[in-house]
From Swiss-Prot:
Known regulation of activity: Inhibited by fructose 1,6-bisphosphate (FBP).
Recorded catalytic activity of this chain's protein: glycerol + ATP = sn-glycerol 3-phosphate + ADP + H(+)
Alphabetical list of Pfam families matching this protein: FGGY_C, FGGY_N
Task of the protein: Key enzyme in the regulation of glycerol uptake and metabolism. Catalyzes the phosphorylation of glycerol to yield sn-glycerol 3-phosphate.
Gene: glpK
The species this protein was found in: Bdellovibrio bacteriovorus (strain ATCC 15356 / DSM 50701 / NCIMB 9529 / HD100)
GO BP of this protein: glycerol catabolic process; glycerol metabolic process; glycerol-3-phosphate metabolic process
HAMAP family: Glycerol_kin
Binding annotation for glycerol: R84, E85, Y136, D246, Q247
Sites where the protein binds sn-glycerol 3-phosphate: T14, R84, E85, Y136, D246
Pathway assigned in UniProt: Polyol metabolism; glycerol degradation via glycerol kinase pathway; sn-glycerol 3-phosphate from glycerol: step 1/1
Protein name as annotated: Glycerol kinase
PANTHER family reported in the protein's UniProt record: GLYCEROL KINASE (PTHR10196:SF69), SUGAR KINASE (PTHR10196)
Family classification: Belongs to the FGGY kinase family.
Length: 495
């Protein structure tokens, strides 16, 4: 075993870049975060400056090393996880961005998607990618950049421009332009990769008008992606051996390695992924079929993905919009002052309904109010709604997979809320497991890189490193669960 078994996990997110130093025991040694600017040029448009992404990433790397009180030479390997779908175009020689990055939230390509739907392209796109035709994914974003950025199409044609998701841009920068690669999980979100072959698809490239030459090489998630060069604060030659998209990284960080394992990340929204093993399960309910990861010399591992638009954001709204609580963490104590909601239901469709309903025009609803209703009832109804909308997604996943869940592993900020976690277990009828380390996205990148570099020799060794904080066992009877889910379904019908 190497003396220096520290792993650096870069977690490049939507609002900040973060670096975690993880030790061989899977423990968090140090963490540093650097926020960066959000750019909104027009309503519905969201951009990031690629130089901000790169600067904030470097700064978080330096700060994490300082906090850990270690030198860059003590890093055994680097793993990268990142906001998915966000895409950029840069000069192949200088590395200078040709335009701001177009962020996953950006809706500017809605018209391009509608045009493709009218031209009957949706069926072939979904069959090859497992995705729904939507501006969320990278393909129409790259198409927009090539059409609208001066000289971009010519530079692309002449081999003078490169395109990629955030992971491939960071890799290119970390290796001083020597490596233009991505992993299967990130590539599966571009809408340009065939998830059944694991490579860029000729038909899709033609549909979106993207030349293959500008795209990175697709690799297994624990590949030898390249080595550091020219960073200054770290020596040259440190290997980068893990890349995985953020939600897939959380699935891996939760050691959801078996078919039927699932994780739920409680963030602004909630993200649920279910490991479907070697089979790309086609959803009958508009869930996304995606690649979880591919390990070297192994078959692809697939997943089903669904998300609710509003999760923690509902609690923020109670705080900022209604003024019911002073800080988000107060919601649990307030909700505990009552035994139930006393008939109050809250459907938090504040920005529409996500999976499995897909009603972007839907708006939020609080119903069942009486003179006896208090802010505590509304607080409790909010927590119940957060759990119930996840149940809708989990039940849909079970139907698509054709087998019962093996339990749910949870992470993200709201996973620290014991009352919410017990509700989640009761309403989905499966035990909920919370790990000691809730930063599972960074941990997933560290596990992947460690696997690639030989810090851990296999998935069994990684499983031994993963530690449980608490398991929430089902307490609710099947009859009570059925009645509660019926009341929720009735509230949804009123939205």
């Amino acid at each position: 075993m190497f003396m220096s078994s520290f792993i650096m996990a870069i977690d490049q997110g939507t609002t900040s870049s973060r670096t975690c130093i993880i030790n061989q025991a899977g423990g968090l040694v140090a963490e540093a975060r650097e926020a960066f600017k959000q750019i909104f040029p027009k309503p519905g448009w969201v951009e990031h400056d690629p130089e901000d992404i790169w600067y904030s990433t470097q700064r978080s790397m330096r700060l994490a090393l300082e906090k850990a009180k270690i030198k860059g030479s003590q890093i055994r390997t680097i793993g990268i996880t990142n906001q998915r779908e966000t895409v950029m175009l840069w000069d192949a020689k200088s590395g200078k961005a040709l335009h701001n990055a177009i962020v996953w939230q950006c809706r500017r390509t809605q018209d391009l998607c509608e045009k493709l739907k009218k031209n009957k392209k949706e069926k072939i796109i979904t069959a090859k990618t497992g995705l729904v035709l939507d501006p969320y994914f990278s393909a129409t974003k790259i198409q927009w950049l090539l059409k609208n950025v001066p000289n971009a199409a010519k530079k692309a044609k002449d081999g003078q421009a490169l395109a990629g998701t955030v992971d491939s841009f960071l890799l290119w920068k970390l290796t001083a332009g020597h490596s233009h690669k991505t992993d299967v999980s990130n590539a599966s979100r571009t809408m340009l990769m065939n998830i059944h072959t694991g490579w860029w698809d000729e038909d899709l490239l033609k549909i979106f008008g993207v030349p293959e030459a500008i795209l990175p090489e697709i690799c297994p998630s624990n590949s030898d992606f390249g080595v550091t060069q020219g960073l200054g604060f770290m020596p040259d030659g440190i290997p980068i051996t893990g890349i995985v998209g953020d939600q897939q990284a959380a699935l891996f960080g939760q050691t959801c390695f078996e078919t039927g394992d699932s994780k739920c990340t409680f963030g602004t929204g909630s993200f649920l992924l279910l490991n479907t093993g070697k089979k790309a399960v086609k959803s009958k309910n508009k869930l996304l079929t995606t690649i979880a990861w591919k390990l070297k010399n192994q078959e692809m591992t697939y997943a089903l993905e669904g998300g609710a638009f509003v999760c923690g954001a509902a609690v923020q709204w109670l705080r900022d919009g209604l003024g019911l609580i002073q800080q988000s963490s107060d919601v649990e104590a307030l909700a505990k002052t009552v035994d139930g909601t006393d008939g109050v239901e809250f459907v938090p469709a504040l920005t529409g309904l996500g999976a499995p309903h897909w009603q972007p025009e839907a708006r939020g609803l609080i119903c069942g109010l009486t003179r006896g209703s208090t802010k505590a009832h509304i607080a409790r109804a909010t927590l119940e709604a957060m759990a119930l909308q996840n149940v809708d997604i989990l039940n849909t996943m079970q139907r698509d997979l054709g087998k019962k869940l093996r339990g749910v592993r949870v992470d993200g900020g709201a996973a620290a809320n014991d009352l919410l976690m017990q509700m989640q277990a009761d309403y989905c009828g499966a035990n909920v497991v919370r790990p000691q380390n809730l930063e599972t996205t960074a941990l997933g990148a560290a596990f992947m890189a460690g696997l690639g570099a030989g810090v851990w020799k296999d998935l069994k060794e990684i499983k031994r490193v993963w530690k449980v904080n608490k398991e929430f066992k089902v307490k609710m009877t099947p009859k009570a669960r059925k009645e509660r889910l019926q009341r929720w379904a009735q509230a949804l019908e009123r939205v």
